[in-house]
C-alpha cells in the first residue's frame, strides 16, 4: 500500500508538521526497537499444529418459560488476564470478555441468541489504569482525564437502537468512572429481530479500536431461528464450529507486539496504516489442529484481524460449500475452491471431510498484504491451521446432515422498492511528500464533522462508493444490511483523482465519464444481504442498502432516529481509527 502504488491513487498529498513528545499513557512507548525479523524469529520458533483448536464457551442469550424462549439479562465484563496462544510461548497479557475473570477467553464467549427474543447485556469495564499496548493520542482518541482504558461494545451486524450501537463517543472506563459524551446507558438492548445469521461483538472506542481488538476484545454472536435453521439439516452440535482467525505478532516474552513508532512519527508518533501479525491464530491458538471425522462440518469463519485479508483454501483441493455470509443465508449454496475474507467478514461454510483424499489437510492463505497489491504470504502467514481426518468410529452417530439445494429466498435487490436516494461515498488517503500515510477520510470529512448521510428509516438507498486509495477497503455500515451489485473500474483515474482533490464532488468531476471501465462481477457467494463488502481500489462499487428488515420488508420496531445515531466506516481498524469513519443519522 505504501510508496509508488499508493501514491498513484491518493486523493491529496499533505505535509503536516506536528511535534509530539512521547505517547500519553503509553506503557510500551519506551520499548527497544523491534524489527520484522525479530517478530518472524519468534513466530518461526513456534511449531505448527501442536495445539488443539479450542471452542469458546457458549452463553445462551435467552431463557425458557413454559417451553417458550424469553428475554434475559446478562452481565459480561472486560478483564485483563493471561492467555496461552501456543504451547511453547509464555503466557500473554490480554484484554478479554467473560462473565467472570476465570471464564474470560480470547476470543470471548459465543453468545447464542434467539430470533425475536430481546437480549439485555450489561457490559462492564474491569480493565486496569493503563493499556497493555501502545496507542496514539494524535489521532482522534478517547482520552479520560483520570486514567483507565476506554471501551464500548458494538454488536457488529445487528439491528438495534442507536443507544445500544456502541458509539465511539459512548466509551467508559472501569466502574463507569468516566464516560464519553455520547454515553447513555450501561445495559444494551439487542432486539434480535433480523434474519438468523452470524454476527460478532467487539470494542468500538474512539481511536482505540485497533489496540483494544488486538488486545482481545472480540467474540462471536449467533442469531438462531429454528423454523429457518432446522429444515436445512446443516451440520449441528459438535459438527458446528466457529473459526475466529486473527493475525498477531509476539515479543520474546510472549507479550503481544504492536508498533511503538509510526510510519510518519513527526506527525503520528505511533499510528501505522495497517497491523500485520507474523503468527496466525484461530480461536486464540497459533496454527492449531482439529481432529475431524469423515463427515460434514459446518465452519463459521470470521476474519477478526485488524487489517489482514485471508484467501483461504484447503491444501488437498477439497471444495468449500458456502451457505451464508455475515448475518444472512444465501438463497442457495455456492461451491468454491477458495474464499476471500476481508477483515470483519464472516462466511458460513460446509466442508465434507468424507470426501477427503488425504488424512491431513492444511487451511492455507494466499491473500497479499496489504490487499490487493502487497507482498505474498510466506511460510508463516500463508498457513492457518490443520485438519486431521480420522475414520468414523463404530459409536459415531450417522451423518444425516446435508448441503441443502436451496436456503432462504430473501427479497433480491431488484425486488425491493426503488431506491430513494443515490449518494457518492468517496474514500481518500492523505500522504506526506515522501509517500507516508497520515490519515484517511470519507468524502474528505472527519467523524466529528456534521452528518451528511441522513437516510429515511424504512427506505432503500444506492451508494456509489468510489475508492481513490491503493487499498481494498472493507466497508461496514451500521444498522442496515446491504450488498454490492456492481463493481466498475474507473478510467483516466489520475485525472479524476486530481479533480476530486480540487473540488471533492463526484458529479462535478463527471464520474459517469470515468466509470466506464471493465465490470468485475460480484462473486455468487457474496450475493446476499451483508454487513461488510469489499471495495476495490480504482473502482466505483454500487451498493444497495436496506434501512429496514430484509426478510419482512418491515421497518425496525424501535426508534432509529434517536441519539447518538449510527456510523459507517472502513473495517481496517487502523484506517477506522484515523479516521475513515463518518456519522450516519436516520430520519423519520
UniProtKB/Swiss-Prot annotation:
It is found in: Endoplasmic reticulum membrane. Induction: Induced by phosphate or potassium deficiency. Keywords: Copper, Endoplasmic reticulum, Glycoprotein, Membrane, Metal-binding, Oxidoreductase, Signal. Cu cation 4 binds at residues 473, 570, 575, 580. It is an enzyme of class 1 (oxidoreductase). PANTHER family: MULTICOPPER OXIDASE LPR1-LIKE. This is Multicopper oxidase LPR1 homolog 4.
Amino acid at each position: 500500500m505504501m510508496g509508488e502504488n499508493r501514491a498513484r491513487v491518493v486523493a491529496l498529498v499533505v505535509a503536516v508538521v506536528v511535534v509530539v513528545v512521547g505517547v500519553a499513557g503509553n506503557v510500551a512507548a519506551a520499548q527497544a526497537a523491534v524489527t520484522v525479523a525479530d517478530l518472524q524469529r519468534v513466530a518461526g520458533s513456534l511449531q505448527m499444529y501442536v495445539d488443539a483448536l479450542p471452542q469458546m464457551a457458549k452463553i445462551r442469550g435467552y431463557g425458557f418459560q413454559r417451553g417458550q424462549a424469553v428475554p434475559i439479562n446478562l452481565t459480561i465484563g472486560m478483564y485483563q488476564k493471561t492467555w496461552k496462544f501456543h504451547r511453547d510461548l509464555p503466557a500473554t497479557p490480554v484484554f478479554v470478555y467473560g462473565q467472570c475473570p476465570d471464564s474470560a477467553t480470547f476470543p470471548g464467549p459465543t453468545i447464542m441468541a434467539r430470533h425475536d427474543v430481546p437480549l439485555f447485556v450489561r457490559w462492564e469495564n474491569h480493565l486496569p489504569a493503563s493499556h497493555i499496548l501502545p496507542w496514539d493520542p494524535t489521532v482522534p482518541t478517547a482520552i479520560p482525564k483520570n486514567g483507565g482504558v476506554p471501551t464500548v461494545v458494538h454488536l457488529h451486524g445487528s439491528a438495534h437502537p442507536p443507544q445500544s450501537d456502541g458509539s465511539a463517543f459512548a466509551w467508559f472506563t472501569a466502574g463507569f468512572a468516566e464516560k464519553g459524551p455520547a454515553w447513555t446507558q450501561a445495559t444494551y438492548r439487542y432486539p434480535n429481530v433480523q434474519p438468523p445469521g452470524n454476527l460478532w461483538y467487539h470494542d468500538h472506542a474512539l481511536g482505540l479500536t485497533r489496540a483494544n481488538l488486538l488486545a482481545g476484545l472480540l467474540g462471536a454472536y449467533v442469531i438462531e431461528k429454528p423454523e429457518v435453521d432446522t429444515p436445512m439439516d446443516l451440520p449441528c452440535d459438535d459438527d458446528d464450529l466457529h473459526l475466529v482467525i486473527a493475525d498477531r505478532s509476539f515479543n520474546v516474552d510472549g507479550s503481544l507486539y504492536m508498533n511503538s513508532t509510526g510510519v510518519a512519527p513527526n506527525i503520528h508518533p505511533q499510528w501505522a496504516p495497517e497491523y500485520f501479525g507474523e503468527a496466525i491464530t484461530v480461536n486464540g491458538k497459533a496454527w492449531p489442529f482439529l481432529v475431524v471425522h469423515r463427515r460434514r462440518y459446518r465452519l463459521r469463519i470470521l476474519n477478526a484481524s485488524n487489517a489482514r485479508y485471508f484467501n483461504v483454501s484447503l491444501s488437498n483441493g477439497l471444495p468449500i460449500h458456502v451457505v451464508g455470509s455475515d448475518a444472512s443465508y444465501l438463497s442457495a449454496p455456492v461451491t468454491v475452491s477458495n474464499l476471500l475474507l476481508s477483515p470483519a467478514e464472516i462466511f458460513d461454510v460446509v466442508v465434507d471431510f468424507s470426501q477427503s483424499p488425504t488424512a491431513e489437510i492444511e487451511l492455507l492463505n494466499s491473500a497479499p498484504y496489504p490487499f490487493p497489491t502487497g507482498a505474498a504470504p510466506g511460510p508463516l502467514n500463508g498457513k492457518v491451521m490443520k485438519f486431521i481426518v480420522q475414520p468414523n468410529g463404530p459409536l459415531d452417530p450417522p451423518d444425516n446432515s446435508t448441503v441443502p439445494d436451496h436456503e432462504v429466498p430473501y427479497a433480491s435487490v431488484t425486488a425491493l422498492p426503488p431506491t430513494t436516494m443515490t449518494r457518492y461515498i468517496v474514500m481518500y488517503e492523505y500522504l506526506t511528500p515522501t509517500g507516508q500515510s497520515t490519515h484517511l477520510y470519507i468524502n474528505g470529512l472527519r467523524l466529528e464533522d456534521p452528518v451528511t448521510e441522513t437516510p429515511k428509516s424504512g427506505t432503500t438507498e444506492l451508494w456509489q462508493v468510489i475508492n481513490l486509495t491503493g487499498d481494498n477497503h472493507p466497508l461496514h455500515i451500521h444498522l442496515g444490511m446491504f450488498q454490492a451489485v456492481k463493481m466498475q473500474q474507473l478510467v483516466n483515474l489520475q485525472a479524476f483523482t486530481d479533480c476530486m482533490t480540487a473540488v471533492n464532488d463526484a458529479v462535478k468531476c463527471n464520474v459517469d465519464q470515468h466509470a466506464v471501465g471493465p465490470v468485475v462481477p460480484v462473486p455468487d457467494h457474496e450475493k446476499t444481504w451483508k454487513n461488510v463488502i469489499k471495495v476495490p481500489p480504482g473502482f466505483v462499487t454500487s451498493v444497495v442498502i436496506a434501512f429496514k428488515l430484509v426478510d419482512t420488508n418491515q421497518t425496525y420496531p424501535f426508534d432509529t432516529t434517536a441519539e447518538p445515531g449510527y456510523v459507517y466506516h472502513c473495517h481496517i481498524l487502523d484506517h477506522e481509527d484515523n479516521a475513515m469513519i463518518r456519522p450516519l443519522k436516520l430520519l423519520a
